């Protein structure tokens, strides 16, 4: 337990020692398939590394047949991917452990963690919606000078892509 605490403290110190107006973007690539957010996000992370291509082509199968009439389209995501290490951190823990959710997201990205989070699409212009709706997005970059975050999801025209959003949009 003490080792974990020291590791977390070291990561927090690294965030505090970082340069002002930092910009960091984690690598993503074009996903092999972009049908649902959870699989598109996972596949875009995996597509960033050429070494993953063999695994994807040999092990990722989205189409399958079964005698069951029920079709389950939720068969793949980051939690099921054996070559991605995931951690589930509840928003209550984020609120307890960090000054703000924005600071948590920045710290995660600085330490090379992608952030998968449900966002209120009515607060983010790129979605082009006014109705309150939660949708899972991938946050993988930030720019402190412009106060923006880089996210990937299915935006206004329902095509998977990425865009920079204002920090205030993410706060809401």
Predicted feature residues:
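Conserved active-site-adjacent core of cysteine acyl-enzyme catalytic domains
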Residues: 4-172
């Amino acid at each position: 337990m003490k080792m974990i605490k020291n590791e977390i403290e070291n990561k927090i110190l690294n965030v505090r020692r970082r340069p002002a107006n930092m910009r960091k973007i984690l690598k993503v690539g074009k996903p092999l398939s972009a049908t649902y957010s959870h699989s598109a996000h996972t596949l875009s992370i995996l597509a960033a590394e050429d070494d993953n291509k063999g695994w994807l082509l040999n092990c990722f199968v989205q189409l399958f047949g079964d005698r069951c009439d029920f079709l389950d389209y939720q068969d793949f995501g980051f939690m099921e991917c054996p070559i991605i290490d995931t951690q589930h951190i509840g928003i209550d823990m984020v609120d307890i452990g960090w000054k703000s959710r924005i600071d948590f997201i920045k710290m995660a990205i600085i330490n090379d963690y992608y952030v998968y989070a449900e966002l209120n699409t009515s607060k983010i212009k790129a979605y082009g919606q006014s109705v309150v709706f939660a949708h899972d997005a991938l946050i993988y970059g930030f720019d402190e000078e412009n106060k923006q975050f880089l996210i990937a999801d299915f935006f206004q025209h329902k095509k998977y892509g990425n865009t920079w959003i204002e920090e205030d949009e993410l706060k809401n």
